[in-house]
A protein has these predicted regions:
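Conserved, single-site charged/polar hotspot
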Residues: 1-244
Length: 244
């Protein structure tokens, strides 16, 4: 099996309609439709165009980070993201989509932001800025900045830092997974282990407690310890194995 070494836009995305550890329906939708749904659920169509663009780029970057790092599949789940804001972004099945938001997403769905010097899409956290406050983008704050004349990238740099850059026209392809469908454990070897190690190293940038391991393709003791640390962080059984 293979996995893209660079970020890509998935043709479709599978959304778990509830918290990750609870049973709920999985819904697979075209990726642009997912972004349109989340944007229509999270922000207001009457906002300034630059605020809408900034929020759409943040929404897209966040979910692409989930896809690229295999955040949920690496924990054994069969979906890319959930529908709940306690973990991810608000997704409401079969909701109405605002026309101007739909048109903007058609233009922007294959663009995302990242940090300079990094390949992965930015895990662009955001909150409404009124009833909830976070370290990322303030949705209402972005509207205020847009009303002051800020461009979409100026708004994003205000919240995420001056070292972010815009990637445009990313390739579109089917979702691929590095986990082969059978357990990877101490002694395993092959391309699947190589991509497991690469994925762990990407995740370790946001969770520095996870030790960096060489991408050798051999599931050695250092890899096992990195897996155990990952499992402890995400409240999984720390058995040092991927898959059961």
């Amino acid at each position: 099996m293979t996995i893209a070494a660079l970020p890509y836009i998935p043709k479709t995305i599978t959304v778990h309609l509830g918290p990750p550890s609870q049973w709920a329906e999985n819904m697979t939708v075209p990726f642009p439709d997912y972004i349109k749904n989340v944007a229509s659920s999270e922000i207001y169509p009457t906002w300034e165009p630059s605020a809408l663009r900034a929020n759409i780029l943040a929404i897209t970057s966040f979910v692409l980070n989930r896809v690229f790092t295999e955040f949920y599949p690496s924990q054994g789940y069969d979906f890319q993201i959930t529908s709940t804001t306690a973990y991810d972004q608000k997704f409401i099945p079969n909701r109405n989509i605002f026309e101007n938001i739909s048109l903007l997403v058609d233009e922007l769905f294959d663009d995302y932001i990242r940090r300079q010097g990094f390949i992965e899409p930015l895990s662009a956290q955001f909150c409404n800025g009124t009833t909830s406050i976070c370290d990322g983008l303030s949705q209402w704050g972005s509207q205020e900045l847009a009303q002051q004349g800020y461009s979409s990238m100026d708004i994003l740099r205000r919240y995420y830092g001056s070292d972010i850059e815009l990637v445009t026209d990313a390739p579109i392809r089917d979702v691929t997974r590095s986990y082969p469908g059978y357990p990877l454990r101490l002694g395993s070897a092959g391309e699947e282990v190589f991509w497991l190690q690469a994925g762990l190293d990407r995740i370790a940038r946001n969770y520095p407690a996870i030790p960096i391991v060489p991408t050798t393709g051999v599931f050695d003791q250092a890899t096992e310890e990195a897996v155990r640390t990952f499992q402890r962080i995400f409240n999984l059984t720390p058995d040092g194995m991927i898959g059961t």
